[in-house]
């Protein structure tokens, strides 16, 4: 099997797509890109304003074209389908909801601080809304970022899909990706 030079890693928020992509990039020299860096306009605080679809696609397309070996983490369902032909391998991470939500809480604390997300904090409402949105992933419909949407999207892909349990250690996941052909 040819070495995958263009890998997309997708899963629910908190499934570990960014961590696995960073591990692949560090070990194999792929450039690591994350869909959030293209989906969202730079704001302070971050993740408040979506970048319009066409400029988002153009920026991501240019970034992918700038490097022959890349790993893209995050979801692009609903806006990034023109990029599907670029993927040599798609890795889908599946993680139980309780583990994902714990990871997300920890990430929010590390990113914003406990005081900011605690009741009365400057980010509390946004934090609660974000976790509520993330908690709906497994039962959500095709109209939102959900397991159902990801499964439908994956089923339509023309290339290989590697499904991994995202509650494994990143090193274990990396070995499984390597067995699938990364050198």
Give, region by region, the residue ranges found by the protein language model.
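NTP-dependent small-molecule kinase module
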Residues: 2-4, 132-183
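Hydrophobic anchor at the beta1->P-loop junction of P-loop NTPases
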Residues: 9
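P-loop (Walker A) phosphate-binding loop of NTP-binding proteins
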Residues: 12
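ATP-binding Walker
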Residues: 15
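Walker A/P-loop
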Residues: 18
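Conserved substrate/cofactor phosphate-moiety recognition/catalytic segment
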Residues: 22, 26-68
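Glycine-rich phosphate-binding loop used to anchor ATP phosphates in small-molecule kinases
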Residues: 53-98
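A glycine- and Lys/Arg-enriched "phosphate-lid" helix/loop adjacent to the NTP-binding pocket
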Residues: 95-145
């Amino acid at each position: 099997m040819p070495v995958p030079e263009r890998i997309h890693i997708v899963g629910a928020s908190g499934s570990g797509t960014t961590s696995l992509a960073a591990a692949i990039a560090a070990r194999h020299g792929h450039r690591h890109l994350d869909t959030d860096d293209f989906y969202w306009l730079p704001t302070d605080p971050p993740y408040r304003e979506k970048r319009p679809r066409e400029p988002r696609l153009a920026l991501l397309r240019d970034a992918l074209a700038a490097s022959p070996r890349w790993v893209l983490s995050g979801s692009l369902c609903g806006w990034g389908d023109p990029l599907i032909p670029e993927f040599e391998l798609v890795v889908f991470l599946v993680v139980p909801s309780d583990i994902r939500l714990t990871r997300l809480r920890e990430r929010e604390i590390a990113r914003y601080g406990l005081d900011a997300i605690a009741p009365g904090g400057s980010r509390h409402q946004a934090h609660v809304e974000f976790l509520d949105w993330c908690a709906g992933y497994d039962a959500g419909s095709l109209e939102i970022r959900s397991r159902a949407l990801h499964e439908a999207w994956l089923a339509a892909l023309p290339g290989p899909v590697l499904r991994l349990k995202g509650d494994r250690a990143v090193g274990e996941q990396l070995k499984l990706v390597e067995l699938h052909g990364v050198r």
